[in-house]
C-alpha cells in the first residue's frame, strides 16, 4: 500500500507531504481500537465520551437498532449538526410530539443545528451504492430556500476553521493548515 499512501497524502497535502516528513503520516488520526463503526460511536456517546456529532445524510434513529438507546446517546452530546434535505427523526429527536416522540425536551441539553442540504437531483455529482454501480448525474433544479450542497457546507466549514486556526493557533493546527485546497472556487469546489 505504500504507493497508494504516498499518492493519497500528496493529493491531500501537495508539496507539504515529503519523504522527509514521512508524507505527513503523523497528521492522520490513529485508532486506539481496531474499529470505530457507527455502533461503537453511539456507545461512546452513551458513555459521555463524545461531545459532538456531525450527521451528514444519515438518520441514525431510523437506521440503527434500538431507537431509545440512540436517542439517549444523542441527548448526552453537547452539540449535534445534522446535514440533510429533510427534517428527520434525528434532527428532531429533542422535540416532543406526543406519542410519536414522547421525550422531555427540557431535559435534553444537546444543541441541535440543522443545515439544510440539497438533494441529489439539485446538484451535479455521482452516485454509488452497495450494488457496485456508479452513476454520474447533472443538476436538475436549484435547491429550495437556503439549502446548500454538501460540498459547499463542508468547504465553508473547512475554510472558516482554517482561517480561525491561522489567526488563533491551536493544539495541532497542521492537518488543517497544510491541507492542499487548489480549487478554482474554494468555497464550492466543482465535482467535475
Can you annotate each of these PLM segments?
Residues 1-191:
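Non-catalytic alpha/beta scaffold blocks inside enzyme catalytic domains
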Amino acid at each position: 500500500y505504500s504507493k497508494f499512501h504516498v499518492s493519497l497524502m500528496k493529493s491531500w497535502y501537495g508539496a507539504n507531504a515529503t519523504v522527509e516528513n514521512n508524507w505527513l503520516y503523523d497528521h492522520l488520526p490513529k485508532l486506539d481500537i481496531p474499529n470505530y463503526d457507527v455502533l461503537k460511536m453511539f456507545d461512546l456517546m452513551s458513555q459521555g465520551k463524545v461531545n459532538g456529532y456531525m450527521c451528514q445524510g444519515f438518520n441514525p434513529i431510523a437506521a440503527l437498532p434500538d431507537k431509545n438507546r440512540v436517542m439517549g446517546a444523542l441527548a448526552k452530546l453537547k452539540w449535534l449538526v445534522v446535514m440533510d434535505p429533510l427534517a428527520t427523526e434525528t434532527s428532531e429527536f429533542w422535540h416532543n410530539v406526543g406519542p410519536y416522540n414522547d421525550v422531555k425536551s427540557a431535559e435534553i441539553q444537546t444543541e441541535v443545528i440543522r443545515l439544510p442540504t440539497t438533494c441529489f437531483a439539485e446538484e451535479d455529482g455521482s452516485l454509488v451504492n452497495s450494488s457496485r454501480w456508479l452513476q454520474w448525474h447533472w443538476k436538475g433544479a436549484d435547491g429550495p430556500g437556503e439549502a446548500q450542497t454538501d460540498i459547499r457546507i463542508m468547504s465553508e466549514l473547512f475554510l472558516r476553521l482554517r482561517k480561525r486556526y491561522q489567526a488563533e493557533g491551536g493544539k495541532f493546527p497542521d492537518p488543517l493548515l497544510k491541507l492542499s485546497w487548489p480549487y478554482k472556487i474554494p468555497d464550492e469546489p466543482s465535482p467535475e
